[in-house]
Amino acid sequence: MAEGEDVGWWRSWLQQSYQAVKEKSTEALEFMKRDLTEFTQVVQHDTACTIAATASVVKEKLATEGSSGATEKVKKGLSDFLGVISDTFAPSPDKTIDCDVITLMGTPSGTAEPYDGTKARLYSLQSDPATYCNEPDGPPELFDAWLSEFCLEEKKGEISELLVGSPSIRALYTKMVPAAVSHSEFWHRYFYKVHQLEQEQARRDALKQRADQSISEEPGWEEEEEELEGIVPSPKEAKIPKETKTTTSPEDEPAPQSPCEETPVEPPAEATPSESSESISLVTQVANPAAAPEAPELPKDLSQKLFEASLEEQSLAEDEGETGPPPPPPSKPLTPAGRASGPEPRPPARVETLREEVPTDLRVFELNSDSGKSTPSNNGKKGSSTDISEDWEKDFDLDMTEEEVQMALSKVDASGELEDVEWEDWE
């Protein structure tokens, strides 16, 4: 029993192995058959194309050459044999090479040369009977315009070459002229078709050239962008121009002077009671802020000197009080009507406070002090000098007397004299 089981196992193993080998060998054979079939098809196709092209060339060559006698019979038999071969091995139309790409054409000289799409279209146009039988395509006006400029006599040499070199044109010419069309109509239609073909080819070349130019110009655009980027400064390199400051000429604005180079400011001349109302009116009009700019402030050094001069004057006044007669009592401040009141004693400390307020315009003091002395020459007139002076008195009603104004002006003169003495001592 054990031996029978071993034999059965060996049989089943052998059968499985044989079946696996058979399946693998079958697949390998199928692959080999498929490869051989593809190889034979490729070789057959290439051979058939070559034989057909060669047979066509030889046949056309034999047909163009004229001969007689026994040689003609031999050539005819050979031509028929080659025709049978070309018909047998010629591939089907769906397997032919596209004529727009490349076409093997047989020339009268017996050589095969590749034709481009233009030559292939020209060959098909020459061998098409519709080219010569039908009316030209397109508007008749265009054909008439072309015909008016076309001269058939100038094409005699080209016509002879076409009849000798192209068997298809020669055969069609022999059949159609003069049975179907006249000699002039035959060639007019042919050359007009060639003219249309040339125009179409020119349009294609122009489109192709434009496409090539657009492709070639793309890197140029990138180069121009790079050049522009090189010309335009980057944000880091770009610098903001500084704002130009308007400067005034030295004539308009005086240069700063040192304290030793400063000249004393002369006080404005005092207005005497004998001055006419016209002169006072002129001064008030000049001092009017609506007509003239504000008075410039006095420099700090001058105010300091005035303050020092006031201190010296105060000390001198104290000395005079001890030794000489006392200073005359200051009069009462001016009233709005411009009349001075009775005497009123003032402490000397008022002079110090007055000196600290010196940087105001002295012309205002002059106008206030002289406003009561001016005679109203323009009474009742709007905008007269007295009205202006009264307005100024209301606006700037300072608690000062004429004596104090005189003292302030004398202090300015004294400071100028002291400065001159200092200059002489320094020299």
UniProtKB/Swiss-Prot annotation:
Keywords: Phosphoprotein
Composition bias, Polar residues: 368-387
Stretches the record annotates as Disordered: 208-397
Modified residues (Phosphothreonine): T353
Composition bias, Basic and acidic residues: 236-245, 347-364
Record PTM Phosphoserine, positions in chain: S92, S166, S384, S385, S415
Pfam assignment, any one: BSD
Methyltransferase keyword on record: no
Record field: compositional bias (Low complexity): 268-279
Listed Acidic residues bias regions: 219-229, 388-397
Bias-annotated ranges (Pro residues): 324-333
Domain BSD: 146-198
PROSITE patterns to which the protein is assigned, alphabetical: BSD (PS50858)
UniProt-listed SUPFAM superfamilies: BSD domain-like
This protein's name: BSD domain-containing protein 1
Organism whose genome encodes this protein: Mus musculus
